């Protein structure tokens, strides 16, 4: 494949149509498990086949940032708990029941399958996102990632 061939490729040629998705009713815990098991950093949120949003590690990290561990004081090898552990436990339990729909980003940058790879790469760079859902009329068709685009360039050393 030469450089001209890459420029002619469309998002639909390289998108991953089998990328894992989440439903808005699933929990944050479900999302974390999916990310870990699938080695991904984000997933489209789909409701009745339509793209409803996207949830990323950043959404989950910022959500959990509100929960602060009370901490410990270590004095001469002895540990003294600080703060209110009951309050911490209650906040952690509340977080465990939070749904993906509550933390997802609803305004999603998307491309269509006929979009150029340059268009997808521009969205990724300007909006600082790693995953761009590929959609047609709100119907999710797949995703294209930074790695998909970078891999094409690495596998095509002729520039």
Regions found by a protein language model. Name each.
Residues 1-159:
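Tandem CBS (Cystathionine beta-synthase) repeat/Bateman regulatory domains
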């Amino acid at each position: 494949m030469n450089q001209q061939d890459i420029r002619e490729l469309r998002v639909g040629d390289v998108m991953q149509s089998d990328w894992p998705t989440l439903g808005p009713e699933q929990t944050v815990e479900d999302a974390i498990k999916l990310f870990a098991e699938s080695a991904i950093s984000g997933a489209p949120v789909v409701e009745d086949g339509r793209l409803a949003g996207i949830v990323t590690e950043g959404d989950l990290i910022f959500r959990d940032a509100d929960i602060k561990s009370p901490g410990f004081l270590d004095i001469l090898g002895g540990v003294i708990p600080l703060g209110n552990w009951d309050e911490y436990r209650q906040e952690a339990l509340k977080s465990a029941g939070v749904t993906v729909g509550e933390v997802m980003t609803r305004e999603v940058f998307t491309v269509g399958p006929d979009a150029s790879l340059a268009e997808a790469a521009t969205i990724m760079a300007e909006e600082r996102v790693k995953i761009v859902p590929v959609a047609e009329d709100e119907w999710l068709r797949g995703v294209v990632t930074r790695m998909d685009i970078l891999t094409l360039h690495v596998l095509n050393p002729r520039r």
